[in-house]
Each structure stands twice: as C-alpha cells, then as structure tokens.
Amino acid sequence: MGDPERPEAAGLDLDERSSSDTNDNEIKSNEEPLLRKSSRRFVIFPIQYPDIWKMYKQAQASFWTAEEVDLSKDLPHWNKLKADEKYFISHILAFFAASDGIVNENLVERFSQEVQVPEARCFYGFQILIENVHSEMYSLLIDTYIRDPKKREFLFNAIETMPYVKKKADWALRWIADRKSTFGERVVAFAAVEGIFFSGSFAAIFWLKKRGLMPGLTFSNELISRDEGLHCDFACLMFQYLVNKPSEERVREIIVDAVQIEQEFLTEALPVGLIGMNCILMKQYIEFVADRLLVELGFSKIFQAENPFDFMENISLEGKTNFFEKRVSEYQRFAVMAETTDNVFTLDADF
C-alpha cells in the first residue's frame, strides 16, 4: 500500500496539491475582512478601523532621518574598543543592514498586496519608509566605523558572507516565498522576525549604552527599537482581527523555531560574551521576549522566563512603552497625534 501522506496516494500530483492549497487560501482570504477585495481600499475616510489608524498616526509622529543622528563622538570610542567588541558590533550591524530590506520585501511583495484595508495599507506604506531609514542608518554606521573597503564590502554582503546571518535571512525569506502558508501564519512569522530576531541584538547595543559607549549608535538603536516595537504591536493587532487564526500549536511552533535560531545566533555563532554579556542570560532574555509576544498574540507563555536585564525594562520592544509617551529625545512630530479639531488655522493673527 502507498503512504497515505504522499500526494500521489491521494490521487494528486504535486502541482495539483499546490493548486489545491492555493485555492483553499483564496477561499479563506475571502472570509477575512482585512483581505477581502473592495473598491473601498482606494479611499481612507471614513475610518473603519480607528485602532489601526491610530497606530499609523503614531508611526507617522515618530518619523526621523539618519541625518538627525550625531555620529561625531562615535569614532573615538570605536578606536578604543577591544578587537572582540569591534568584531561583534560590526557583525551585528551587518545583520541589521540586511534584515530591514528583507522586512520590506515582505511588505512590498506580500502584505501590502494582500491586505485591502486602507488604514493598514497606510501603516505598511509608512513602515516601508522607516525600514529604509533603518537600513540607511545601519549602512551609515558601517561606513563610519569600518575604514577598510574590503571589510566594508564583506559586511554589506552579510547574507552571502556570513552563514549565521544567512540562516536568519533564509528563515524570513522562506516565509515570503511560501504560497501555502496562511496570512495569519506569516503575520506571526514576521512578528517573530521583528520581535525576536532583533531583540537580542537590540539588548546587546543597549548594553553598550549602559557602559557609556558609542552615543550615536546607541541613540539610533533607541529610535529603531522603538519603531520595531510598534511594528510588532501592529502585527499583533492585525492578528486579532483575523477570523481564521492559526492554531496555538502552530503559533508556538513558529515562535519556538525563531527563538532557537536567535539563541544560537547570539550565544554560539556571534556570542555576546565578546562584549562581556552573559550568554545564559541572553538565552533567557530571548525567551522572555518570546513569551511577551505570545501573550500579545493572545496565547499563553511557553518559557515562563523573567527579564534578566534590568536595563531593558523601559526599552521599546513593546511599541506602547514609555518611549512614545515620553517623546523620546523629542522625536515625535509636532501635532501629528493631536485631534484635527486642535489644529485650527486662522488668518486673524496680529502681524
């Protein structure tokens, strides 16, 4: 007897099976309010999803550019770092420089085309813009610190030159290319990319801030981690609106897979011990972040991990932490979050 799990056993060849899966996903998409095609997608008002719109306005209010980050004090600090510290920082920056482009690939190729709700499309459009700013910032940091053109080229091509960066990139790229997975599964996967794959590296750079090092690097990291926290929160909000959510078992499978890759990245491939951090505590921190993401998605914790890094308590890996309310370093655009009725323009001022 043939294996019942094999496609031919069910009377389908692989192409037919793939077509069947695609059709199933199309049927499920029609059941999803977020994905249902409508001419309403071309017009923003009246707002149908005020919470999604509010997140878009929050992202808009947080806009910044690479030119606004002062790197003048970083180079003297860089020149005083140990070789291990330089190695670690440069390779982390190489990972980040490539990763934002991958996130944008997903937004352009998949999410922006699949989601039909204009409020969400506004958010994704702005996310694409700010991810480009992040990528420019990381590239500028590499350009500033690394003077050797060959080393610089090696870092800019990290997906090809560094196996451990390639492993993380391949995991994310696989989800972009996957035509069988549901929208909900891919929302979880990219929440894991921005909420888990970035978390340990953010923590490592904040560790440098605690030591008073590299003010330009650490300030840009503060802004970027705030942005990524908001993106992760937005993914969780989109997930809550889904009618056909993936099962808790499937969500846990995706999250655990991401946790294992990130733990390997920062404790074996590019160990945080190089900058004096504790690898065991870093593993715990990644588990803590994963638990927090699971709760925000509406599921129970897996690891029951405590946050081992006190300096990360107020850091914006949740978009709604102190960062936004405190107007971090004044990087909140004037009046963007104000009610429209507050913005009254008159011509009766005294000149």
Curated annotation (Swiss-Prot):
Fe cation 1 binds at D100, E131, H134. GO terms for cellular component: cytosol; nucleus. The active site is at Y138. One of its GO terms (biological process) is deoxyribonucleotide biosynthetic process. It catalyses: a 2'-deoxyribonucleoside 5'-diphosphate + [thioredoxin]-disulfide + H2O = a ribonucleoside 5'-diphosphate + [thioredoxin]-dithiol. Its main location: cytoplasm. It comes from the Eukaryota. SUPFAM superfamilies: Ferritin-like. Its EC number is 1.17.4.1. PANTHER family: RIBONUCLEOSIDE-DIPHOSPHATE REDUCTASE SMALL CHAIN (PTHR23409), RIBONUCLEOSIDE-DIPHOSPHATE REDUCTASE SUBUNIT M2 B (PTHR23409:SF19). Plays a pivotal role in cell survival by repairing damaged DNA in a p53/TP53-dependent manner. Supplies deoxyribonucleotides for DNA repair in cells arrested at G1 or G2. Contains an iron-tyrosyl free radical center required for catalysis. Forms an active ribonucleotide reductase (RNR) complex with RRM1 which is expressed both in resting and proliferating cells in response to DNA damage. Heterotetramer with large (RRM1) subunit. Interacts with p53/TP53. Interacts with RRM1 in response to DNA damage. DNA damage. This is Ribonucleoside-diphosphate reductase subunit M2 B. It comes from Macaca fascicularis (Crab-eating macaque). The gene is RRM2B.
